[in-house]
Amino acid sequence: MTYTLVTGATRGIGREVARRLVLAGQTVYLGARDLAAGTDVAAAVGATPIQLDATDADSIAAAVDRIRDEVGLLDVLVNNAGIAGGQRPPGEATVADLRTVFETNVFGAAAVLEAFTPLIEASSTPVVVNVSSAVGSLALNTAPNSRWTMLAYPMSKAALNMMTIQYARAFPRWRVNSATPGLTATDFTGPRAADAPSIEQLRTAGMQINTVEQGAEVIVQLALTPPDGPTGTFVGNDGPVPW
């Protein structure tokens, strides 16, 4: 039996990842800030709901205690919880913007991983997937054709990628990887300002927009990484992504 936790799993990619991993035979804890919403989604996908707010230390500790008491270990952690705020460019973005985005995307992911480390270490086949983004790639951001001008969100994903690298190095028995689902048609990537382009406008402009199923694919595959599989990598649906 494989015991898995997917954070931020009440909708979008997180929900689809949880659903797919249940179908793959894993016992999935579906992490949700709102337990009522999580209970409904878990029932729909065949998972077990668990209250988990990545920005709340008490919530994380309670989730760790529950999983420890119920199964004693954690085989797979999918660090999916995140926010898409912080779209403003340098010169407009504030330190407050950075703090808001980092609180969930970096400090939240780090807090969850730190707290669950003993349970992950207790697994014979430990796997960690940090859900990142191509906008966190330094190589892609410095490419001549880069169009990204955001500050907070790309910074947060670059930091998350560094966490992947360092955990992969510190725990060589674990399989720790970053996944980028690509731009995916969910409410996470929908308009965030009055003049923000819609998903349909982006698609019309020639940008590739993944379905939720397509966006979840690389995360699911990394969650199923075998003990001799890759670690310390950054991967999208089309293969490796440069750091």
What is each stretch, according to the model?
Residues A158, R173-W174, S178, A194-W243:
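C-terminal helical subdomain
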Residues I83, G91-F102, E121-P172, L183:
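Catalytic loop of short-chain dehydrogenase/reductase
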Residues Q51-A62, V95:
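The beta1-alpha1 cofactor-binding region of Rossmann-like NAD(H)/NADP(H)-dependent oxidoreductases
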Residues T10-R11:
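Conserved glycine-rich cofactor-binding loop
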